């Protein structure tokens, strides 16, 4: 696909699609709740539609209208064995959280996905669930999908110190803990996104959060809710960076989710001297949302690492692009988790942006980016990774001559089906 290039500025306002993490979880909680859940501004992208498909296969009635998704909850006990394997496509969130949800059911399940999912590590989820009494294994006894879950197991409480900072692993354990006997205690290594914890309360459940320690009791029931999903800050990040680095730009992003566990990119933009203002913030069904305004800015390099990394892990590819347009060196460290995303994002970012003229060195746990560098035309690939694909489109906006051809552009639809349309809507 030929990307949009050499446009002098992006100006206007857009509303980015609903938050991907919250869209997944809204379906999951709607399914395990009693009664009806109505979801507005749901992200109708491949990953989240895969979650809907999975729960329909488990016997949950889900209606899709133009404005709403309506989930007729069955409770945990109302879930039924699927007729065949659950195919979750490219969604790591779906497979890992479903492992927790299905660990305590009274039927067997096989969960599989695409080629990317088959390469992603699952022991980080399987091992703690097995400690709770779950029986599950990967292909040929490995940790890789397809994952077979043997039902009819009694789950027991546990106290678990998480070896990695992962909201997906934490959430899988929480879903299993809701079906276990007694109180499960989870100690996080670093604070990660907390949408699951907040949704437990939103759907009428109880959970204790004290710093890095979470306590959740088994045997809880939930009640269906009405909710509006705020815009995804990870999707907004591409337009934040576009507005900062494209000459003559001013972009307004409305109804963006402002959960503090997700807004690390705001802190980085401030460190680098970028113009980013949040206004009109309000609570939307228990979640903070607001309008983010960015303008073209002169930027300086910075160092990014430590406990901010879980707050911006998905934004690192586009933050790396931002750093190519900053004066001086930017160092990103403590981000080895990027190696086990849809692709090895450390290598992918360095390889593809260097093709375009960037000066980036990959490290074991991050990137060293030397700026400021002009970017030029090249043939690039997304590696089938939606965030790499979108980052490369933002990079292409800086190319003054020639074409930027993107292989596997279709990956963008995983999280942002209208991404290219929204770019065009902001062109001067």
Curated annotation (Swiss-Prot):
Pfam families, per database record: EPSP_synthase
Annotated pathway: Metabolic intermediate biosynthesis; chorismate biosynthesis; chorismate from D-erythrose 4-phosphate and phosphoenolpyruvate: step 6/7
Gene3D superfamilies in the cross-refs: Enolpyruvate transferase domain
Annotated positions binding phosphoenolpyruvate: 20, 92, 120, 168, 345, 387
Keyword Magnesium: no
Family annotation (InterPro entries): Enolpyruvate_Tfrase_dom, Enolpyruvate_Tfrase_sf, EPSP_synthase, EPSP_synthase_CS, RNA3'P_cycl/enolpyr_Trfase_a/b
Catalytic machinery residues: 314 (proton acceptor)
Entry keyword set: Amino-acid biosynthesis, Aromatic amino acid biosynthesis, Cytoplasm, Transferase
Enzyme Commission number(s) of this protein: 2.5.1.19
GO molecular function annotations of the record: 3-phosphoshikimate 1-carboxyvinyltransferase activity
Reactions accelerated catalytically: 3-phosphoshikimate + phosphoenolpyruvate = 5-O-(1-carboxyvinyl)-3-phosphoshikimate + phosphate
Residues where 3-phosphoshikimate binds: 20-21, 25, 166, 168, 314, 341
Subcellular location: Cytoplasm
GO cellular component terms listed in the entry, alphabetical order: cytoplasm
BP GO terms, sorted: amino acid biosynthetic process; aromatic amino acid family biosynthetic process; chorismate biosynthetic process
Function, in words: Catalyzes the transfer of the enolpyruvyl moiety of phosphoenolpyruvate (PEP) to the 5-hydroxyl of shikimate-3-phosphate (S3P) to produce enolpyruvyl shikimate-3-phosphate and inorganic phosphate.
Subunit structure: Monomer.
NCBIfam families documented for this protein: aroA
Family: Belongs to the EPSP synthase family.
Name assigned to this protein: 3-phosphoshikimate 1-carboxyvinyltransferase
Record organism: Listeria monocytogenes serotype 4a (strain HCC23)
Encoding gene per record: aroA
